[in-house]
From Swiss-Prot:
Its cofactor is Mg(2+). Belongs to the TRAFAC class TrmE-Era-EngA-EngB-Septin-like GTPase superfamily. EngB GTPase family. Keywords: Cell cycle, Cell division, GTP-binding, Magnesium, Metal-binding, Nucleotide-binding, Septation. Gene3D superfamilies: P-loop containing nucleotide triphosphate hydrolases. It comes from Xanthomonas axonopodis pv. citri (strain 306). The gene is engB. The lineage of its organism: Bacteria, Pseudomonadati, Pseudomonadota, Gammaproteobacteria, Lysobacterales. This is Probable GTP-binding protein EngB.
């Protein structure tokens, strides 16, 4: 499975619904605040240093970016949200586009919400998780930059976030800790994403794996 994910290549960028690929197959979307480490997580997932552009200026992703793994197997990088310098009219366009994508996209099989472990579950994070819940889609909370906290603080935050999302969304949301610096949690993330994409030999990550809340 990991070798298949490593085949991901840039496919297209969509600024509006007309530019989306045909609605078939399997897609996993990645959402997150502009400085949460979304692009870095995509690069680590695929073992590529520059698949998703990592910018020093938050909010540079201004469209839905599709990375193709196999025919009709895509990773989708959503625009980063919550960055004040993005013009309001552009924010409104993104909001309407993403809303339509979540409500109508049949190929969408799961959502990864990328959150800085030090600042999890902001309003937009909860909104994204709510989109998935409304569609009955599984979601996965990726608590990035775990290396910034000690092990005890990591586990405390993990359990707190798990409790909060369970109270709001039931058992459709899983959560794990992750660090791009130490590569903590990369295999767990691959298990989740690979399972949603239906890749050969990619079973979903099991309950209680290291880095995940039970």
């Amino acid at each position: 499975m990991s070798l298949l994910i490593e085949q991901a290549r840039y496919h297209l960028s969509a600024h509006n619904a007309r530019q989306l690929p045909d609605d078939g197959g399997y897609e996993v979307a990645f959402a997150g605040r502009s400085n949460a480490g979304k692009s870095s997580a995509l690069n680590a997932l695929t073992r590529q240093n520059a698949l998703a552009r990592v910018s020093k200026t938050p909010g540079r992703t201004q469209q839905l970016v599709f990375f193709q793994i196999q025919p009709e197997r895509y990773l989708v990088d959503l625009p980063g949200y919550g960055y004040a310098k993005v013009p309001q009219d552009l924010q409104a366009h993104w909001q309407a586009f993403i809303d339509r994508y979540f409500r109508t996209r049949e190929a969408l099989r799961g959502l990864v919400v990328v959150m800085d472990i030090r600042h999890p579950l902001k309003d937009y994070d909860l909104q994204m998780l709510g989109y998935a819940a409304e569609r009955g889609l599984p979601a996965h909370g990726l608590l990035t930059k775990a290396d910034k906290l000690g092990r005890g603080q990591q586990m405390q935050t993990l359990q707190k976030v798990k409790k909060e999302v369970t109270s709001r969304f039931g058992d459709s949301v899983t959560v794990q800790t992750y660090s791009g610096e130490s590569r903590q949690g990369v295999d767990e993330l691959r298990g989740i994403v690979g399972g949603w994409l239906g890749l050969d030999g990619a079973p979903p990550a099991a309950e209680g794996e290291p880095g995940q809340a039970p």
